[in-house]
Amino acid sequence: MDHYDVVVIGGGHAGCEAAAAAARIGAKTLLITHSTSTIGEMSCNPAIGGIAKGTVVREVDALDGLMGKVIDKASINSSILNRSKGPAVWGPRAQADRKIYKNTMQDIILNYPNLTVLEASVEDFTITEKDEKFTVETVITSDQQVIYTKKLILTTGTFLQGTIHIGSYNTPAGRFGEQPSIGLAKTLEKYNFKLGRLRTGTPPRLDINSINFSGLQEQKGDSEPSPFSYMSQSIDLPQISCYLTATNTRTHEVIKNNLHRAAASNSLKDIKAPRYCPSIEEKVRRFSERNSHQVFLEPEGLDSNIIYPNGITTSSPLDVQYEMLKTIPGLEKVNIIRSGYSVEYNFIDPRELYHTLETKKISGLYFAGQINGTTGYEEAAGQGIIAGINAALSLNSKYEPFILKRSDAYIGVMIDDLVTLGTSEPYRLFTSRAEYRLRLRSDNADLRLTELGYQISVVSSKRYTILKNKKQEIITLTNILKNIITTPTQLARHNIPISQDGVRRSIFDLLGHPNINMEIVSRICNTVKEFNKNVAEQVAIEAKYAPYFDRQDADIKAFLEEENTHIPHNIEFSQIHGLSKEIQEKLEYIKPLSIGSARRIPGITPAAITNILIYLRYYKSKKTS
């Protein structure tokens, strides 16, 4: 019988990151997937990144993850969203060549050190019990292979008892043409995990040769594409355009007349879909005052004849999809290559997890990705890398759990939201979810996380050396700019617009002014041109935000004081005087490990926090006496 340190079930975005992270740390790792040909599949839109999401990809990359490097190899239309706004809300995004992305990911995974890949369907897993504690023991495949493992990570995506819907038609599937995971769903029920149902959707795929692009608005990427990975030097594939069209009143009339035929109005009406990525039927129903909704026509590859119409996910029958599409400019003669559909699937209540993504019920069992109620490739990758890291670290008692706080990363914000608040609808990250977004930017993920990753052996020495050199360059350039003092008169000689108030300023302070950038500063400081472009941009961003950092850092300090006030995992909240039954039940269910985490649980009052703090002082004194 085979024995592994870590077994990962599922080869999607969460599974690939989980397996690779565990293997990097040195764990003997097995990735089990239905088919190696679907590893790294982009099930829905052929794009990576976006607002908040792009920052997560950079954070995964900063921990030596795969997604950033792979999308840089597959990018065919790259841009920074929100570029006109502040850097704290910039969103790197790249349209991918779907085939190149998948092939690149497969090539990495199938040749990764310490990682074995097995084609099989997992139907069950077993646990052992000792002293009323349950621990993962084996994984059982459909052909009755028994595989022993110390740690198990489930990254089942939409496959957990998945069902696809197109109008009144439905069939068991986790993705179009692929069988769902039924056995594992029954296993989780058997072990009393709290399961719910969610759904998501995808639009029809269109034949590029049947679309009239003349008259549509061209959407080019950035003239100088920015890589996602801190290890990538450039984007090498040719960059091609997307096109923008829109629905109209005729489109909406077709949809309204056929709402009763959409699965979302019938069999799926009580199952929550992504709030911020609604189907076209839901858009028409919820925003009845609008006469138009944007549709982005996105190529699926350099040599692909498939167009992904971003903005019109649907669960309507095929004939309605045709009727609807033919009312949209450019799509009057469109041919559908594959129907749009909705898929419903099981997810677990993420409040049953620790911040490590290990389950509270069963030791050694981890969940990552859509099984935790999230939506999006990037959210899945962020959870996958954390689950893989913690599964591998837990094999060695010298390591503490690797937990990213809300002040560390968007990944930390997401996981804290999930395990503390739970979710009743597909969870998506936004910059507005992060309290400390001035510090959690897409440009500085490596400065925030790479050293932490190196300390636990998930980051290579090569990447860490690059980080150290970059840090030193940032310090050097910052000091140079802080030590050059100028006057308004001197600046005027260089045609640099600044108030003639007689105030002497350092060049670093000057960068904090609106409309002053490194290109302007280089007129009076040629040394700037000697530094790497990314380093110069990093220093400029820090200068822009410098006046605001003191307040944000004070907020972070107060936050960390509560985060570092730990609550023992074995505490009995029923023994704390002054807590209502309702509050005791919430605390027992979620089992917060810090005062900060307890405070974020809905319904936990300031008085309850005070009572817990009093009890903790008593608990600590009793333990030391």
UniProtKB/Swiss-Prot annotation:
Record-listed FAD binding positions: 10-15, 122, 181, 370
GO CC annotation, single: cytosol
Functional description taken from the UniProt entry: NAD-binding protein involved in the addition of a carboxymethylaminomethyl (cmnm) group at the wobble position (U34) of certain tRNAs, forming tRNA-cmnm(5)s(2)U34.
HAMAP family with a match to the protein in the record: MnmG_GidA (MF_00129)
Record bears the keyword rRNA processing: no
Cofactor(s) named in the record: FAD
GO molecular function terms noted in the UniProt entry: flavin adenine dinucleotide binding
Protein residues bound to NAD(+): 273-287
Family: Belongs to the MnmG family.
Matches recorded under Pfam families: GIDA, GIDA_C_1st, SAM_GIDA_C
Species this chain originates from: Ehrlichia chaffeensis (strain ATCC CRL-10679 / Arkansas)
BP-aspect Gene Ontology terms: tRNA methylation; tRNA wobble uridine modification
Protein name: tRNA uridine 5-carboxymethylaminomethyl modification enzyme MnmG
Top-level taxonomy: Bacteria, Pseudomonadati, Pseudomonadota, Alphaproteobacteria, Rickettsiales
